[in-house]
């Protein structure tokens, strides 16, 4: 059985951050990422990259972090008592892209690696990650393309990965207090450590690289659609759901804040502008209403 190689994982994560930032800058043509290197007092650090006020992207955050410590926070050991008393390392790349044009969806991707070690015992390790899409105005062909790429990433590794991780994504990115999916899903997986390290690491590399294949063609197709105040106001309203999910339900946000992570980097996923409206309901049969009836539903897209 192949042993975990932390240095290989870190090298891939750093190069993935580079390639995604380069691709986003290339398509935006106006704004560039600003890098913020940071250190964590309790151990580790990272590099946060933010692009703001671009021609295509209102805000894009692509974060690499590598944190370590002698003991895990409560959020990590609550479901895994076997991790108590182990030193840990957690590293990953996390990104959220908020476009300016409401016809381009928001996208999120994440790949991460976790290892907990104790003298005289085998390490406990796993990978997690995925990518998901949050449209404001739905286009069926875009969602089908997104899920086709997700399936093509999974199929070489296991014929049941796509169905399993698609369902996990639908279940995870769900606002229980709204009884509503956050978007149209994609892939989400966690605790991946079988059959061995090499298999899992190769899959995670495919997920990380597959994100751009899934997202950029949608951006190219929708970036020139004209939009006005009506579309902008709906986009700002729907962005509120992103805020609600991240602050109420997201385990990564909770883990980051509880483990003494860097707050600015953890909350970089927040949209730059948001609008909340009391008891808003879209007019029936409008494009806004169709988002709810045709897209924010559990559906097999491919």
Swiss-Prot record:
Residue spans making up a coiled coil are none
Please name the pathway: Porphyrin-containing compound metabolism; protoporphyrin-IX biosynthesis; protoporphyrinogen-IX from coproporphyrinogen-III (O2 route): step 1/1
- Site description Important for dimerization, residues in chain: 177
Q: What class of enzyme is it?
A: oxidoreductase
Identify which residues the record assigns to the active site: 108 (proton donor)
- For this protein, the Enzyme Commission number is 1.3.3.3
**BP GO annotations:** protoporphyrinogen IX biosynthetic process
Q: Where is this region: Important for dimerization?
A: 242-277
Residues reported to bind substrate? 94, 110-112, 260-262
What keywords appear on the UniProt entry? Cytoplasm, Heme biosynthesis, Metal-binding, Oxidoreductase, Porphyrin biosynthesis
Cofactors named for this entry:
a divalent metal cation
Catalyzed chemical reaction(s): coproporphyrinogen III + O2 + 2 H(+) = protoporphyrinogen IX + 2 CO2 + 2 H2O
The terms describing its cellular component in GO are: cytoplasm
UniProt xrefs under InterPro entries: Coprogen_oxidase_aer, Coprogen_oxidase_aer_sf, Coprogen_oxidase_CS
Task: Locate the residues binding a divalent metal cation.
Answer: 98, 108, 147, 177
Record's subcellular location: Cytoplasm
GO MF term list: coproporphyrinogen oxidase activity; metal ion binding; protein homodimerization activity
Q: Share what the entry says about its subunit structure, partners included.
A: Homodimer.
Family annotation (PANTHER family): COPROPORPHYRINOGEN III OXIDASE, MITOCHONDRIAL, OXYGEN-DEPENDENT COPROPORPHYRINOGEN-III OXIDASE, MITOCHONDRIAL
UniProt record similarity statement: Belongs to the aerobic coproporphyrinogen-III oxidase family.
Q: State the function annotated in the UniProt record.
A: Involved in the heme biosynthesis. Catalyzes the aerobic oxidative decarboxylation of propionate groups of rings A and B of coproporphyrinogen-III to yield the vinyl groups in protoporphyrinogen-IX.
Designated name of the protein: Oxygen-dependent coproporphyrinogen-III oxidase
Taxonomic placement: Bacteria, Pseudomonadati, Pseudomonadota, Gammaproteobacteria, Enterobacterales
């Amino acid at each position: 059985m192949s042993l975990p190689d932390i240095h290989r994982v870190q090298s891939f994560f750093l190069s993935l951050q580079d390639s995604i930032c380069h691709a986003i800058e290339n398509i935006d043509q106006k704004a560039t990422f600003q890098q913020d290197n940071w250190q964590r007092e309790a151990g580790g650090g990272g590099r946060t990259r933010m692009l703001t006020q671009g021609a295509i992207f209102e805000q894009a955050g692509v974060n690499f972090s590598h944190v370590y410590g002698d003991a895990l926070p409560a959020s990590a050991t609550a479901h895994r008592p076997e991790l108590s008393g182990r030193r840990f390392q957690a590293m990953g790349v996390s990104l959220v892209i908020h476009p300016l044009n409401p016809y381009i969806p928001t996208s999120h991707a994440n790949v991460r690696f976790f290892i907990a070690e104790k003298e005289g015992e085998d390490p406990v390790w796993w990978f997690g990650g995925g990518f998901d899409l949050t449209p404001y105005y739905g286009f069926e062909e875009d969602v089908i393309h997104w899920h086709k790429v997700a399936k093509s990433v999974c199929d070489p590794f296991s014929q049941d990965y796509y169905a399993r991780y698609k369902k996990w994504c639908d279940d995870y990115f769900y606002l229980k207090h709204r009884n509503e999916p956050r978007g149209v899903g994609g892939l989400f997986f966690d605790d991946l450590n079988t059959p061995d390290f090499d298999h899992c690491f190769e899959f995670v590399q495919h997920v990380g690289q597959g994100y751009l294949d899934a997202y950029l063609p949608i951006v190219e197709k929708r970036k020139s659609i004209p939009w006005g105040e009506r579309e902008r106001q709906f986009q700002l309203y729907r962005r509120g759901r992103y805020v609600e999910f991240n602050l109420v339900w997201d385990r990564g946000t909770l883990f980051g804040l509880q483990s003494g992570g860097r707050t600015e980097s953890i909350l970089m996923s927040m949209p730059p502008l948001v609008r909340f409206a009391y008891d808003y309901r879209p007019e029936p049969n409008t494009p806004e209403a169709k988002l709810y009836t045709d897209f924010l539903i559990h559906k097999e897209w491919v």
